[in-house]
Amino acid sequence: ILDRDRRFAAKIYEGHKKTSFPNFVAVQWNKTRPDRVLKTAKEFKNIAQVGASLQSIKNDVLHAIKRKNLTFDQIAQLRKELEKFGQKKIFSELIIGLPYETKESHIEANRQLIDLNFEVQNYNLHLLPGTEMDTEESRKKYFKKTGWRLFDNAYGIYDGKIILEGQEVVLQTNTLSVEDFKYIRFYHFLQQMMWTKKWYYDYLKFLKIYNIHPISVFNKIIEKCKKDIGEIGNLYLEFMKDYNEAESFDSFEELEKYWREESNFSRLKKGNYGKLNMLYTFKLVLNHRKAFNKFLLNISKEYATSLGLDVDNFVDLCKELLKFQ
């Protein structure tokens, strides 16, 4: 990012004020010059959300991928400065599957970003042809298993033939098991829906007042989902079935064979399959909202009991909050 970029930002915002275009600007922000980021963001006003992507907070991970991050002190200061001129939304990005990352370190990174009130976007590592992670040396050194999944909306019929585009994703590393990846997959869904997309943001902020961290809530939900034999347990099983069947093909050829079957391809055409996080957000919000709210109230009751709170009062407060989520 250069000093001149703030002048570009000012001109873009000037156009927005005059014509209402552009309404929003997507920006890939510099990772090492928070001073210039701040100056440019000020000129954009509120039409460009600021990001401070980390990928990981683990030093050996950052060393392996040859990356240098802003420090958490720098990020916290950046947030304070942005809030001074009304820029309240700030996001960060993390990647699961990087060399030396663990389930615990990845979740801890999410915890720290949530504590700074960031919106967090989590991604699975996929191996892009021509990148260092895709070399034979890196594959042997870091990755034990990979699989293939469909790129979101990357399909079509051309000259009567179904054409698909896939991506190779990491499913197991030296420090992350297959089961870790499965756990994290559903965890990412919960965090994106409840925290980042704000469907249960106020509920989570309320629990945080009682030192019940959103991370604890997500983990508790997963624990309960695995045991639940009702509506929410079935939704969890449906999610994991889609993950196991459609996001972990052994080869691109297997992916093509699966999605070219008429029954499977019709799911794509009808919009019944897509990015799992958003697909299941819609399913839960539209079809299972009451059941999920009841599920959360049972969890809230457990928290109140363990903390020695007035259970009925605490649950009533949660119930009122959930009416507006």
Question: Residue locations for each model-derived region?
Answer:
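Extended interaction regions within the primary functional domain
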Residues: K11-A26, V37-I47, A52, N117-E119, ...
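Radical SAM enzyme core and accessory elements
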Residues: E168-Q325
